[in-house]
Regions:
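Glycine/charged-rich beta-loop-alpha catalytic/anionic-binding loops adjacent to active sites
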Residues: 52, 80-85, 108-118
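N-terminal glycine-rich anion-binding loop in soluble enzyme alpha/beta folds
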Residues: 5-64, 68
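Mixed-charge interfacial surface used for oligomerization/domain docking
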Residues: 2-3, 12-19, 24-25, 30, ...
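Active-site cofactor/cluster-binding pocket
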Residues: 67-83, 87-103, 107
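Short beta-strand segments
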Residues: 8, 87-89, 118-119
């Protein structure tokens, strides 16, 4: 069986120890908060990150671009590995498209290696679960083609349904209008959302109050 490495995006929200333990390389979608840009080797502690958000800090994110993707993959290819990349939903980010472009660019330099990009249509821990299935299948001795095929066949079975406590971040991401965010905040509206079969973030409904939103889930 050909050697291969699983790669993904850090949007899978898995612990960094998990990546290290399972020898997974991840593409870092950098973010800027309070004027400081955070890169792969300068992660902020998650507790500190969310504390700053609650205090009003507004992070902005950047997708992994083609060159950054190729820089992550080249050492793996140089070591004789194929690559199975499990990408953040193409309905939420351009990172999957960047990965596909990078894979095509690298074909010329590494004609004997194979790079397979799977659009997970997932986000956050849904993507993390997607990755974990791939990891367990690899441990069970499945080859890259078997794993990629299974993931493509079953990816619509990974369901995301969730609620958020703050409408302002949905407004900043273009998910709701400013008027809806302001009014919803005033009357304590909590949306219930899901990720559809094309990987887009779609509202399922809305209720008043955090407790009711959790019951709705």
């Amino acid at each position: 069986m050909r050697n291969f490495v699983i790669t993904t995006d850090n949007t899978a929200d898995l612990p960094y120890d998990y990546y290290k333990k399972n020898q997974i390389e991840y593409l870092f979608l950098s973010y800027t908060m309070d004027g400081k840009n955070y890169q792969k080797n300068a992660e902020m502690d998650p507790g500190e990150f969310y504390r700053k958000m609650r205090q009003g800090s507004m992070p902005t994110t950047s997708q992994a671009n083609v060159e950054e993707t190729m820089e992550t993959w080249r050492p793996l290819l140089d070591e004789g590995n194929d690559i199975l990349h499990l990408a953040f939903s193409s309905g939420l980010s351009g990172s999957c498209n960047s990965a596909r472009i990078a894979a095509n660019e690298l074909k010329e330099s590494y004609p004997d290696r194979k790079i397979t990009v799977v659009d997970s249509l997932c986000a956050s821990l849904g993507e993390g679960l997607f990755v974990d299935y791939a990891v367990e299948m690899k441990k069970a001795g499945k080859d890259m083609e078997e794993i990629a095929g299974w993931l493509e066949e079953h990816k619509l079975n990974f369901c995301h349904v969730f609620t958020v406590d703050d409408l302002n971040h949905l407004y900043r991401g273009g998910r709701v209008s400013k008027a809806a965010a302001v009014l919803g905040t005033m009357i304590n509206i909590k949306p219930v959302l899901h990720v559809d079969n094309e990987g887009h973030l779609i509202p399922l409904g809305k209720v008043r109050g955090r407790k009711k939103s959790l019951i709705k889930l």
